[in-house]
């Protein structure tokens, strides 16, 4: 089975939507997907942050994007990832250093989508072995 690794370095809504959409395509193609939450990605998955007012890379487009998602029944990215984890092989790993930077050093500091906390060497190793590597 082929595999994809995604390095999610941003916690912006755009990057979260792109990550969930690309993951959906990979699951549809029967690929294993490993998502590594790097700095901003780790922040977006903190329990006290997730799902609430994710920032946009282009704030002037935030309202239009929200309306477009609602009007086209595009699910919230974390809801989409939850469904994809149920449908395919999707694992979400948090970089330990990123978690510590945001004051979240333990697994219980993150939403239940996060499978584990790992070192950056694991991310690099998985990138070496993956068929497809994406960074958002």
Residue ranges of each PLM-predicted region?
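Short, glycine-rich nucleotide/cofactor-binding loops
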Residues: 5-16
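Histidine-anchored nucleotide/phosphate-binding helix
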Residues: 17-30
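Short internal beta-strands
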Residues: 33-39, 93-95
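N-terminal beta-loop-helix "entrance" segment that forms/cooperates
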Residues: 41-54
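Short, hinge-like loop/turn segments at secondary-structure boundaries
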Residues: 51-56, 110-113
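A glycine-rich helix N-cap at a beta->alpha junction
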Residues: 53-88
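Ligand-binding beta-strand-loop-alpha-helix segment within the catalytic cores
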Residues: 72, 82-86, 90-107, 111-114
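Glycine-rich, aromatic-bearing surface loops/beta-hairpins
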Residues: 99, 117-136
């Amino acid at each position: 089975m082929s595999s994809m690794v995604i390095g999610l370095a941003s916690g912006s809504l755009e990057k979260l939507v792109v990550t969930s959409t690309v993951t959906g395509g990979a699951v549809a193609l029967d690929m294993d997907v490993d998502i590594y939450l790097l700095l901003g990605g780790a922040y977006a998955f903190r329990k006290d942050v997730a799902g609430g007012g994710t920032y946009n890379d282009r704030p002037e487009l935030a309202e239009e994007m929200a309306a477009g998602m609602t009007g086209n029944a595009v699910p919230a990215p974390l809801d989409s990832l939850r469904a994809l984890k149920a449908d395919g092989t999707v694992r979400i790993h948090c970089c330990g250093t990123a978690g510590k930077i945001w004051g979240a050093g333990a697994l219980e500091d993150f939403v239940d989508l996060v499978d584990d906390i790992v070192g950056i060497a694991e991310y690099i190793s998985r990138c070496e072995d993956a068929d497809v590597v994406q960074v958002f």
